[in-house]
Amino acid sequence: MRTAFRLQFSAVDHGSKKVKNSPAFSHVEALAPASSANLGAGFDVFGVALGALFDKVSVDVVKVDKKVQLFVSGKGSEFIPTKPEKNTAGIVAEALLKASGKNCGLIINIEKGIRAGSGLGSSGASAAASALAINEALGLGFTDKELIKFAALGEIAAAGVPHADNVSASIMGFFTAIVSHEPFDVIRFPMPDNTKFVIATPEVIVETRKARSVLPKHIKLSDAVHNVARAAAFVAGVLTNNLTLIGMGMNDLIAEPYRASLIPGFFDVKKRALEAGAIGVAISGAGPSVLALVDSSKSMENRVAEAMKEGFEVNGIHCEVVIAKPGPGARIVRREEK
């Protein structure tokens, strides 16, 4: 049920930009935040950047003809492929290098701070940081929206098709909504100041491909109407600083009923979180992380965190809990000239 789109750049057409023949920097480092996609009713459309977990990507420009080398360290790095064509950051690197037309090579070092298979945009964060760092290093001048399209290509490695919900949030930050695929367009809005998310990540791995395979090929009209209404409530809540409306928008009838089976204890965790004061609860992305919305002005986050932890524990599952605010997108943290 992913919606793919075409990448409309080539080595000749750089979006009508003049690109320098030589790289701008020899070494660039970028950070990109974790993200939660879907957020309930916004399947494949909504995303939010989570200002608590990050991937770091370092790019070195070398005099090796159009070759990408990839190294991975950090959380779960032993399970992440280092062949560029099988890694989200590697796919992005090869696409940007081809688009640049430059006769150079790239050495990519990924430091994972976000566990793969957690539903927190781990692959998207690596792709986003890679896109931003390479754009800076090679002096390509692509805009954020253009970089999102390159980063979305990287998601082929994780999901089988390009998709932009996670990478949009990781690059642009805060709340993002994809409003068109052809032509591609995405909008960003800040969320209310009192927005906080409690994220419980159980020790369960859910691969995006697997989570997609359990989704129905056809949905009931009534379920589609429900989700459209709730998605509208979510956006209205963001625009009017109304957390109650945002919480309503986290109610999903299209993906959650099917993906919940991949997360032991999900409905127990959701029930306990709501009883503890959460305004809304949803599966984060493809799962298994569970995302709860809380009002930080009421100091409910620790109580909700404990409730979610207990919900998994009574089902025999250990989990890690993180509390995060919506945050800014990917950023450059270091540059070195030649």
Predicted regions and their residues:
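Gly/Ser-rich oxyanion-binding loop with an adjacent helix/lid
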Residues: 103-183
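Short beta-strand-to-turn element immediately C-terminal to the catalytic PLP-Schiff-base lysine
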Residues: 60, 170-181, 292-295, 333-335
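A generic local secondary-structure boundary/capping motif
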Residues: 44-48, 156-161, 165-168, 184-190, ...
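Glycine-rich, charge-dense phosphate/pyrophosphate-binding loop(s)
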Residues: 238-338
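ATP-binding N-lobe of GHMP and related small-molecule kinases
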Residues: 5, 11, 15-118, 132, ...
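Glycine-rich beta-alpha junction loops
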Residues: 34, 52, 174, 201-206, ...
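Acyltransferase
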Residues: 193-271, 275
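Short, conserved charged micro-motifs
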Residues: 65-68, 208, 298-304
